[in-house]
UniProtKB/Swiss-Prot annotation:
UniProt KW keywords: ATP-binding, Cytoplasm, Kinase, Magnesium, Metal-binding, Nucleotide-binding, Transferase
CDD domains cross-referenced by the UniProt entry: ASKHA_NBD_AcK_PK
One cellular-component annotation, GO: cytoplasm
Repressor as UniProt keyword: no
Name the record gives this protein: Acetate kinase
InterPro entries membership: Ac/propionate_kinase, Aliphatic_acid_kin_short-chain, Aliphatic_acid_kinase_CS, ATPase_NBD
Residues holding ATP: K14, H209, L210, G211, N212, G213, D284, M285, R286
GO MF: acetate kinase activity; ATP binding; magnesium ion binding
Record pathway: Metabolic intermediate biosynthesis; acetyl-CoA biosynthesis; acetyl-CoA from acetate: step 1/2
Cofactor binding note from Swiss-Prot or TrEMBL: Mg(2+). Can also accept Mn(2+).
Entry's localization field: Cytoplasm
Length: 405
């Protein structure tokens, strides 16, 4: 009996198969560049070996699900004999809104609620819904568990999650900060507790999940206390293609100047801003660093804007946690591999005793290895820990569907 875990991105679909009885991972993979002319499918075996193939453009996430199931039952790969071996599917869903606060087993009512809030995470939730419905068609009798990134942040207090807008907007329309990357933050908090040998309920952290989407989380006594993303994943840090914090008046101003609808401006803020918007080159940090080496000004400026924003948030969260912080933890694809971003984000903090070991930092470039990158004399630990959202999803699945099923 198998568990399939699906993580639906804006243009990707990650998947993994686990043995139900012992939580052992059997295989994982990713379909990349969905909606592009040429898509890529990668399979990662348990021994670390990979196979990669190019496919004629996979046009949407439904087709990606169908392709994934064909791969999983491919007789040459010997992953599954039949799809009926899969009894449970766990989905990462970015936004649960105000009505879906905890992980749930899918039913028609839950699916309808999810559709009603899809506009709150326009890059992710609609694709997750497509994937869920595609699985329903192919495996109608399997249980599907939805795990929300917003669930982790339910412990944030009103003074931190409310915007200074008419209170009726919150009471009548649930306009508030929700926060994201919660599955990642939940895992990192537990793992940091183990590494630091400190009980979770007394653990204070500042966690930075830095990838194409990026956010920061203040953790107080092992629970989410504040976070940079808002009602949607657009707020906060400058990201790969998202603007992060801006003056909201810009939306109407540019709508008038460019003769575009506010919806079109919002689309630009989500898909054409951030690192891509400033550099006008790429949202891939590898490309950006190459351009910086070539002396390209806008790419350098994009990194300066990104790391300055990170530095401001770290400083504000140190204050929000009453200057009682056990560790600063970097995670996400950029967070664990990009030593340059970490160094720039923490530059100057040595003046208050938060010391990055530059040599250790430069050595920490692996997607898979945990690293302590602070100096011996640093007042708090600085860690780089690869995230494991699948671990959080598995834990939630077993809480909802016991192993003696």
């Amino acid at each position: 009996m198998k568990i399939l875990i699906i993580n639906t991105g804006s243009s990707s679909l990650k998947f993994a198969i686990y043995q139900y009885e012992n939580s052992k991972k059997i295989i994982s993979g990713i379909v990349e560049k969905i909606k592009s002319q040429k898509s890529i499918i990668k399979i990662v075996n348990t021994d670390g070996s990979t196979t990669e193939r190019f496919e004629k453009g996979i046009e949407n996430h439904q087709k990606a699900i169908e392709k994934m199931f064909k791969i999983l039952t491919n007789s040459d790969l010997k992953i599954l004999k039949t799809l009926s071996e899969i009894k449970i599917i766990g989905h990462r869903v970015v936004h649960g809104g105000s009505s879906l606060k905890n992980s749930v087993i899918l039913n028609n009512s839950i699916l309808n609620k999810l559709k009603q809030i899809s506009e709150l995470a326009p890059l992710h939730n609609p694709n997750a819904i497509t994937a869920i419905e595609a699985v329903l068609k192919i495996l109608p009798h399997a249980k599907q568990v939805l795990c929300f990134d917003t669930s982790w942040h339910q412990t944030i207090k009103e003074h931190a999650f409310l915007y200074a807008i008419p209170y009726s907007w919150y009471k009548n329309h649930n306009i508030r900060k929700y926060g994201f990357h919660g599955l990642s933050y939940s895992y990192i908090t537990k793992r940091s507790s183990e590494i630091l040998n400190k009980k979770i309920d007394s653990l204070n952290l500042i966690i930075l999940h830095l990838g194409n989407g990026a956010s920061i989380n203040a953790v107080k006594n092992g629970k989410s206390y504040d976070t940079s993303m808002g009602i949607t994943p657009l707020e906060g840090l400058a990201m790969g293609t998202r603007s992060g914090d801006i003056d909201p008046s810009i939306i109407n101003l540019m709508s008038t100047i460019l003769n575009k609808t506010t919806k079109q401006i919002e689309e630009i803020l989500n898909k054409e801003s951030g690192i891509l918007g400033i550099s006008e080159k790429s949202n891939d940090m590898r490309d950006i660093w190459n351009k910086i080496e070539e002396g390209e000004y806008q790419s350098k400026l994009a990194v300066e804007i990104m790391t300055y924003r990170i530095k401001k948030y770290i400083g504000s969260y140190i204050a929000a946690l009453d200057f009682n912080v056990d560790a600063i933890v970097f995670t996400g694809g950029i967070g664990v591999t990009d030593y340059g971003i970490r160094a720039l984000a923490l530059k100057g903090f040595e003046k208050i005793g938060i010391e990055l070991d530059l040599e250790k930092n430069e050595m920490a470039q692996s997607k898979y290895l945990e690293s302590e990158i602070s100096t011996i004399n640093s007042k708090l630990k600085i860690l780089a820990i690869p995230t494991n959202e699948e671990s959080t999803i598995l834990e939630d699945i077993y809480n909802l569907i016991p192993k003696n099923l």
